[in-house]
């Protein structure tokens, strides 16, 4: 039985890769089936999932709301797919309420610091699509992370205004600005540089680069930084997909798709990438990262080992990864909205 279970991802990959001519509705069906399993898992384990995992499901909630709002009513199949999405959204909303209450009780400090992003209305979805630029890829990348999770959290709470009770939002210290605009960062420090600017934009912080006196950066806008980071995250994903699609790198691969997709870079929504992600889901539990020890890939990004279970990673009792499950379902929500927009010629990618 164990051997059959281990062969399932390979079987799925062969089946999916053989369907090169999948229609958008076929792809949407596959995404909805995967999301249904992921939400069923959250129904059962939501109270045990950490903050990062819950944020992933919060983003999925925003994506499902947008999907059901804009779903093309073209035929019976499309209507039945929308009905399935509405049903999942109702289930998810109920489970999220319970999960948020549990987080507030079990992890009050982190809950308070990141409470604003635990509301799906905080997250804005792309209104139009763009593509990354290979010419913006760094000539060299650091071997180690540029900063740790403590620094990342601190800078983001300055933007959110949660660094103290009734704190002023949109504070950008020189240290945070210099850290979050440093070029050549890899992995999680790169994706969190993008997340920093995403949070600032969604919070309404319009002067994030004010005071940057570096002549080499004088013409670089927030939008340009996002394009630089996502262009490098695209290169990272291409390298990962080509060389090392193991449990160790799957998490960062999916996180890059999630974040850059939210910024509006449609070239992250590649069909073969989606097909691979679908094979990584445990078909019985509905989670991601099961039986893969991915916790060690966060070590550089953590300022102390004991924080591993707080936000960045938590391996649940069933062996599933809290972080990877959260980013995977929200990335799949992004794929869903992209393929729905592909049926709407007004939302086709901008060349």
Swiss-Prot record:
Q: Does the keyword Transcription apply?
A: no
Q: Which organism is it from?
A: Danio rerio (Zebrafish)
Cleavable signal peptide: 1-25
Cellular compartment(s): Secreted
Its chief place of residence is secreted
- Describe its partners and assembly state: Homodimer.
Name of the protein described by the UniProt record: UPF0764 protein C16orf89 homolog
One GO CC term, this protein: extracellular region
Could you tell me which Pfam families the record lists for this protein?
DUF4735
InterPro entries in UniProt: DUF4735
Lineage of the organism: Eukaryota, Metazoa, Chordata, Craniata, Vertebrata
Q: Write out the similarity annotation.
A: Belongs to the UPF0764 family.
Arranged from A to Z, the UniProt key words for this protein are: Secreted, Signal
- PANTHER family given in the database record: UPF0764 PROTEIN C16ORF89 (PTHR33539:SF1)
Coiled-coil boundaries: none
